[in-house]
Amino acid sequence: MAGGREIKTKIKSVQNTRKVTRALEMVSASKIRKAQERMKTSRPYAQAMKQVIGHLAQASTDFQHPFLIEREQVKRVGYIVISSDRGLAGGLNNNLFRKMLGEVRPWQGTGAEIDVVTIGQKASAFFRRIKVNMVGSVTHLGDSPQVEQLIGVIKVMIDAFIEGKVDRVYLVYNRFVNTMTQKASFDQLLPLPAAEHKVAHHDWDYLYEPDAASVLEHVMTRYIESLVYQAVLENVASEHAARMVAMKAASDNANKMIGTLQLVYNKARQAAITQEISEIVSGAAAV
């Protein structure tokens, strides 16, 4: 059994660690509220853009945007993968990467090549490590990411799709469900799924200048950017929620460990005192 001094040192070390995990838990709890507000604020814009895209796509009968055309053969698949920049978020990032690799294997089985654009330090490090073809990367977006920070990497994948270098593009991120649940999501980004640009009726009364096709050409890119931006906000909220839960679990485990060590320390101290008393009694009897 370890000595009393070693046990007290261990208790002190665990207590210091608990202070850190509690602080991180409180910081994440504060940040998650702001992240949820930003996420909810951006949703109406994304939904309005989706509706406009549907109207424009059906209004333009003589023009079909490349983003709406499904290609017969898929030779190369692109992924925009969103992760956090920092760790200490439980299995948030690793679970996403593991599920993505599961999604990629069927494509590789057909002979399709894979291109990846990463958003976030953890995704960048992971795909470099496993030697996947990375064609773009952006990191350190912070807790309040802006669309302008994402335009460059989004353009890389959009241009590749328009030029025919990539035949399909997926958006991979953690969707925020609630504080306790974050779901790994794989959304087809390009070409836009039929449900994204088809509506059930034609009773809108929009007037397009100069025409629906010209407007569609400009709006499509903005729509793709809004989808990626919304996914980034979802991932930020998921990150803070996962970190808050992970740090709470760490604090709880620290409390249990401190209790166990305190019990061991008390037993060691009791044994030492009992031994001293026995030695004194034995010495007195000898006299």
Swiss-Prot record:
The biological processes this protein is annotated with in GO are: proton motive force-driven plasma membrane ATP synthesis
Recorded topology in the membrane: Peripheral membrane protein
Q: One matching Pfam family, short form?
A: ATP-synt
Q: What task does this protein carry out? A: Produces ATP from ADP in the presence of a proton gradient across the membrane. The gamma chain is believed to be important in regulating ATPase activity and the flow of protons through the CF(0) complex.
PANTHER family (UniProt xref): ATP SYNTHASE GAMMA CHAIN, ATP SYNTHASE SUBUNIT GAMMA, MITOCHONDRIAL
The family assignment reads: Belongs to the ATPase gamma chain family.
Indicate the quaternary assembly: F-type ATPases have 2 components, CF(1) - the catalytic core - and CF(0) - the membrane proton channel. CF(1) has five subunits: alpha(3), beta(3), gamma(1), delta(1), epsilon(1). CF(0) has three main subunits: a, b and c.
Name recorded for this polypeptide: ATP synthase gamma chain
